[in-house]
């Protein structure tokens, strides 16, 4: 992409209601803009990031043997009444009527719809296990939408549902999805913890949450720095009467609090703030029994499916990545999530030598399937550089006055360090860095 053709409306000021870094920088960097309360449009850069995250999620799920589907965003209220969740979801579930006064729901999740899809289509234990997922729009009518993409009303979510002939097989799939989720978040370059959690309105006997560690997180966790142990304080009896008090404390305040007990590995435990980006549940027969979704076992007996459900906040991950990776200048995207991993910046577009080299490197990187943007605009160098830091391209290749001596600069967004390299070896150096 040439910057002169790209729609990237950057801004100097953040919205007045933006308090979190991700909200400020995603709007200022031209990734998103607000359509209404808790409703956001994804602009070209934001859409690229969203699709890159979606691609990682899809690739790992497909490798784990999951099947992608796409369900209707609108579901009949009758499904929710039969499962008993039409009341449990409360006002977060937005109901609508069609011209015939039939009542529908803008789906906040899809357990009921997925059970209805499988019901009478999967009838034998021989067809199990089965894991179906979608990456689709959801809507929850949040009372106080805030924090940009972290607490919106409309969002993109991956929701998956597995069907089994036994509890043991359901637990096996639950464990497989836990490992698959770990692979997804690791590929995205995130520091995260898996913690025991409360099942809430979804229901079921066991659940785990996946939290990106960030100072701005709404949840308070107890984590061990020596092993992978983590727990949401909501699940620990010792802290249940202090949940509101601890959740309201800042990360700096939590750092000063001491936890008396040790981790099972012998190391000290610490409070951390987390942003929930994934949640997996062991549902048992809660939904299949309520919706009379049965299969025939090896003895010909009719039984309700054992189920589990698995969710990832795909659009929430866009914000969570920046909450964990930013500085005072703007976004710092991880390599897997960056809209463009290389930004070629020509300091003076009127200089034929600079433009010629820029065009040559741009063509070579595109031929090598590198996600590259070529800043061929006539803006001042300082303006271009500030925009590059705000947007957060991992590497900016600067072609400027040093070219007279045969050199170009490569700026690393994460370290903010620049190196000078021979212009003839710039391509090879970039390819080495982005591996």
Swiss-Prot record:
InterPro entries from the xrefs?
Answer: aa-tRNA-synt_IIb, aa-tRNA-synth_II, aa-tRNA-synth_II/BPL/LPL, Anticodon-bd, Anticodon-bd_dom_sf, Pro-tRNA-ligase_IIa, Pro-tRNA-synth_IIa_bac-type, Pro-tRNA_synthetase
Q: What class of enzyme is it?
A: ligase
Q: What is its EC number?
A: 6.1.1.15
* Lineage: superkingdom: Bacteria
Could you give one GO CC term from the UniProt record? Answer: cytosol
Q: Which CDD domains match?
A: ProRS_anticodon_short, ProRS_core_prok
PANTHER family for the chain: MITOCHONDRIAL RIBOSOME PROTEIN L39/PROLYL-TRNA LIGASE FAMILY MEMBER, PROLINE--TRNA LIGASE
Task: Report quaternary structure and partners.
Answer: Homodimer.
Q: What is the documented function of this protein?
A: Catalyzes the attachment of proline to tRNA(Pro) in a two-step reaction: proline is first activated by ATP to form Pro-AMP and then transferred to the acceptor end of tRNA(Pro).
Q: What is this protein called?
A: Proline--tRNA ligase
**Lineage, opening ranks:** Bacteria, Pseudomonadati, Campylobacterota, Epsilonproteobacteria, Campylobacterales
Q: Which gene encodes it?
A: proS
